[in-house]
């Protein structure tokens, strides 16, 4: 990590609850690959059914669909979904290699890794 990049990239999974199997599988997929990138990545599970995750879920939904889309047309972020630095990357559980490629792409773009 070079001096200009002291912040880790943020990976967030929109997570409804433990009874949501796709949410569990998305969480497991991320937890399986992030140890490889641990010094560059921060992981957060946005549990939007809890008060602690509601605001972030709405914030990410507004970034996708705008205020009107969320509040007038009831459009929200897909569940489960995966965001990297606030950008939607996956709206379904990605294969391991695709998730690793996406993380590495963001790490390269942000100067954490060299482009090989």
Stretch-by-stretch model annotation:
Residues 29-36, 52, 73-76:
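Cysteine-centric redox/oxidoreductase cores and disulfide-bonded domains
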Residues 39-60:
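Thiol-based oxidoreductase modules, predominantly thioredoxin-like and allied folds used
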Residues 18-21, 51, 89:
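Short acidic, S/G/P-rich loop/turn micro-motifs used as interaction or catalytic elements
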Residues 2-46:
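Local sequence-structure signature of Cys/Sec-based thiol-disulfide redox active-site neighborhoods
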Residues 23-27, 57, 93-96:
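Conserved strand-to-helix beginnings and helix N-cap segments that scaffold or border functional pockets
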């Amino acid at each position: 990590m070079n001096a200009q990049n002291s912040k880790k990239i943020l990976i967030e999974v929109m997570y409804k609850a433990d009874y949501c199997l796709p949410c569990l599988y998305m969480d497991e997929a991320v937890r399986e690959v992030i140890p490889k990138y641990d010094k560059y990545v921060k992981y957060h599970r946005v549990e939007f059914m809890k008060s602690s995750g509601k605001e972030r879920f709405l914030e990410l939904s507004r970034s996708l669909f705008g205020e009107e889309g969320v509040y007038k047309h009831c459009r929200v972020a897909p569940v489960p979904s995966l965001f990297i630095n606030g950008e939607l990357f996956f709206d379904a559980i990605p294969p391991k290699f695709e998730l690793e490629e996406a993380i590495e792409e963001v790490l390269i773009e942000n100067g954490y890794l060299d482009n090989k």
